[in-house]
Amino acid sequence: MSTHADSKPWTVPALAEAKRNGQKLVMLTAYDAGFARTFDANGVDLILIGDSLGMVVQGHDSTLPVTVADMVYHTRAVARVLQRALLVADLPFGADATPERALDASLQLLQAGAEMVKIEGAGFKVDIIRYLVEREIPVCAHLGLTPQSVLRLGGFKIQGRGDAARQLVEDARAVAAAGASIMVLECVPTPVAAEVTAAVEVPTIGIGAGPQCDGQVLVLHDFLGLDSGHRRPKFVKDFLAEGGSVAGATRAYADAVRDGSFPDEQHAYAS
């Protein structure tokens, strides 16, 4: 099985090739140059500037207060040091409310160094994704638990159970057809995430979505066992405890994702 060379910078087309080759993708969030440099040098394939920074960096109770300016600042800091990992940046809450707003925010993020933008949800967002892709902006979709929908959802809850599973699969097909290059599946039962992964040609990146996704992502503070001021989800594992250092934890996480040992049943939702 051919795999992406460790020293070769990641590109958007290489992500789909990785899925075809059965190569697991390793993703982490980062918000500054120091952590990003360490992750980049120790096996991380994609780095996400997540609007999770609103909770773990800024101290908010949700991601809703994060602005485009916040995202641009952190994107610039991370982009300066990356040599290998592909850089993805979130469109924050409200920035993708219309095609024009999404385009403006996306251009700012790409000019700051991002190589892809992430959009939460389906529905009218499918047309937003298509609009951006038609304008040469790579997009990462995000389905399942979408933190920007926390008010509507009534909290951070598992998605895709029961009748909602079929809708999730349909949404995945829709965002893939619209041109999304990859998609994050968050807090989705393992069997449903496996069905989505089999239904689409683009790579799926799981976070609380079981081991059958094409890759995994964790929030920096969670995978290092740091206190972010919020309850730790079931799917989180403290890799610093076994890695002994940030670099060691990163290598341990990357190895566990690639060999399929993470996530195990303890760190996933069976139903």
Curated annotation (Swiss-Prot):
- One function term, GO molecular function aspect: 3-methyl-2-oxobutanoate hydroxymethyltransferase activity
Q: What class of enzyme is it?
A: transferase
User: What are the binding positions for 3-methyl-2-oxobutanoate in this chain?
Assistant: 51-52, 90, 118
The cofactors required by this protein are: Mg(2+)
* Reactions the enzyme catalyzes: 3-methyl-2-oxobutanoate + (6R)-5,10-methylene-5,6,7,8-tetrahydrofolate + H2O = 2-dehydropantoate + (6S)-5,6,7,8-tetrahydrofolate
Give the signal peptide as a residue range, or say none if absent: none
Cross-referenced Gene3D superfamilies? Phosphoenolpyruvate-binding domains (3.20.20.60)
The keyword Metal-binding is annotated on this UniProt entry: yes
Sections of the chain in a coiled coil: none
Q: Where in the cell is it found?
A: Cytoplasm
Where does this protein act, in terms of pathway?
A: Cofactor biosynthesis; (R)-pantothenate biosynthesis; (R)-pantoate from 3-methyl-2-oxobutanoate: step 1/2
UniProt GO BP: pantothenate biosynthetic process
Q: Which Pfam families match?
A: Pantoate_transf (PF02548)
| Keyword terms | Cytoplasm, Magnesium, Metal-binding, Pantothenate biosynthesis, Transferase
Q: Which InterPro entries match?
A: Pantoate_hydroxy_MeTrfase, Pyrv/PenolPyrv_kinase-like_dom, Pyrv_kinase-like_dom_sf
Catalytic residues, chain numbering: 186
Q: Which GO terms describe its cellular component?
A: cytoplasm
* Binding-site residues, Mg(2+): 51, 90, 120
EC number(s) per UniProt?
A: 2.1.2.11
Extract the NCBIfam families matched here: panB, PRK00311.1
| Function summary | Catalyzes the reversible reaction in which hydroxymethyl group from 5,10-methylenetetrahydrofolate is transferred onto alpha-ketoisovalerate to form ketopantoate.
Q: How does it assemble?
A: Homodecamer; pentamer of dimers.
**What's the family?**
Belongs to the PanB family.
Protein name as annotated: 3-methyl-2-oxobutanoate hydroxymethyltransferase
